[in-house]
Amino acid sequence: MERSHQHQQLRKEEHDTLSKLKQMPVESLNLEAISIATNLYRSAQRLRVKMETEVLSTYNLSWTAFSILYDLWVWGALETRKIAELSGISTATASNVIKTLEKKSFCRKSIDTRDRRLVFVSITDSGKQAIEELYPEFHKGETELIAGMTKDEQKILTGLLRKVADNLHTT
């Protein structure tokens, strides 16, 4: 019941947004693009808040800190600029988040021996332990995200989201 109420609320929100945007002096307003972008943004925000509140708070981690730690866990040592790129944040923001993770002993920095301007970051055993403890609960949130979708709908959505990501790929 609550779920359908949220769905209706989102529809009303969409309707209100579109009604307001129709008043904008834009020649050809693509209402579907607006709906997709709005729903994608709202879904991402809700997921982020849910995960930070219900899962990541046990380690006092932000979504961004968890994302960086997760990337280090998956790929091993990464250069700071690559971490920023993967997380969709500036290098300065990445450096600040890495400092926080370093203070928690979840990662360590090392300077490239050939090019001292390059800083590589790697996950520590404590960082691995944090990911391995957090991920089962994190995954529960991921599965809640797709509750009520058939396997076919999940595959279709995955394909469509990959297209969206490809459209926004900047490098």
Curated annotation (Swiss-Prot):
The keyword Transcription applies. InterPro entries: HTH_MarR-typ, MarR/SlyA-like, Tscrpt_reg_MarR-type_CS, WH-like_DNA-bd_sf, WH_DNA-bd_sf. It comes from the Bacteria. Residues 80-103 bind DNA. The keyword Disulfide bond does not apply. GO terms for biological process: regulation of DNA-templated transcription; response to stress. GO terms for molecular function: DNA binding; DNA-binding transcription factor activity. Keywords: DNA-binding, Transcription, Transcription regulation. Residues 33-166 form the HTH marR-type domain. Pfam families: MarR. This is Uncharacterized HTH-type transcriptional regulator YwaE. It comes from Bacillus subtilis (strain 168). The lineage of its organism: Bacteria, Bacillati, Bacillota, Bacilli, Bacillales.
